[in-house]
């Protein structure tokens, strides 16, 4: 599917965040290898990074390479792509075969034991960017199940990269089902990536930097920066109801109301 204003905004927020981290010296001026998930949001993120000339041409160390990566290699915005799977359209694949002299020193496919190897991911300082279905107030991520029961997709290699990345980012729209459901929830209905692995949450609303924050500080950052305005007050009310004395406040009796 083509990009739309919502996914474009998420992509731009990711690009702005990475450019800001580079300016602060957290990311070196030469940049770092990126891992990207698959789908519309991932393509929008890569598109935004390709357009943002404050970010230098970069490398991909990822699991799956899609059409968008090939396009950015042709444009010179991606210098090199390493993956274990080339998942592109037939036309794109034919274009690669027809231009093999150009691509032979710009693409490599490795076994997943290498492409997803935790030590390699950590040593290279990979920045991981993956898509969430829902994120809770403390930074736990559900990336596979709708309502905690219906599988949308598998976890793929996102766990390998998220847990070992230099910076781990999750993106999602702030709402689903035409605004009827908030993607920012008090507690995820299914857990794929825990708060200990998630550094940054980005929606079309903004960026929540969770690094170095306590659970309550993470909750405040996520509500303020990532939640949709229609659901912010509800989430603040939940946090207040959960009480202020616990390390990670929850009001279990109220959770079912959020997911209905």
Which residue stretches match the model-derived regions?
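N-terminal active-site beta-alpha-beta segment that forms phosphate/nucleotide-binding
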Residues: 2-95
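Non-transmembrane, aqueous-exposed alpha-helical and coiled segments at domain scale
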Residues: 19, 29, 131-136, 141-149, ...
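Gly/Ser/Thr-rich active-site loops/lids in small-molecule metabolic enzymes
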Residues: 53-67, 140-171, 193, 225-234
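Ligand-binding beta-strand-loop-alpha-helix segment within the catalytic cores
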Residues: 65-135
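Structured beta-strand/loop patches that form or line metal/cofactor-binding pockets in enzymes
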Residues: 120-129, 146-155, 161-198
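A hydrophobic, small-residue-rich beta->alpha segment in the mid-to-C-terminal subdomain
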Residues: 193-241
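Conserved small/polar residues in nucleotide/adenosyl-binding loops
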Residues: 258-260
């Amino acid at each position: 599917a083509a990009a739309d204003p919502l996914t474009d905004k998420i992509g731009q927020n990711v690009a702005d965040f990475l450019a800001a981290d580079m300016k602060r010296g957290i990311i070196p001026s030469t940049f770092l290898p990126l891992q990207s998930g698959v789908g519309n949001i991932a393509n929008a993120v890569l598109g935004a990074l390709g357009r943002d000339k404050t970010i230098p041409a970069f490398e991909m160390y990822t699991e799956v390479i899609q059409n968008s990566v090939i396009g950015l290699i042709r444009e010179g915005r991606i210098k090199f792509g390493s993956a274990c799977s080339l998942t592109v359209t037939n036309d794109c694949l034919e274009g690669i075969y027809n231009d093999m002299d150009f691509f032979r020193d710009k693409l490599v496919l490795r076994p997943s034991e290498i492409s997803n190897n935790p030590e390699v991911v950590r040593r290279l300082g990979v920045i991981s960017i993956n898509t969430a279905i829902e994120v809770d107030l403390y930074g736990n991520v559900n990336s596979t199940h709708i309502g905690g029961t219906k599988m949308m997709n598998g976890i793929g290699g996102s766990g390998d990269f998220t847990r070992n990345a230099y910076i781990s980012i999750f993106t999602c729209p702030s709402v689903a089902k035409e605004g009827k459901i908030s993607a920012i929830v008090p507690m995820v209905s299914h857990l794929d990536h825990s708060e200990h692995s998630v550094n940054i949450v980005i929606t079309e609303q903004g960026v929540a930097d969770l690094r170095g924050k306590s659970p309550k500080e993470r909750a405040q950052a996520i509500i303020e920066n990532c939640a949709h305005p229609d659901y912010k007050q509800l989430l603040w009310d939940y946090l207040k109801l959960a009480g202020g004395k616990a390390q990670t406040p929850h009001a279990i009796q109220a959770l079912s109301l959020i997911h209905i």
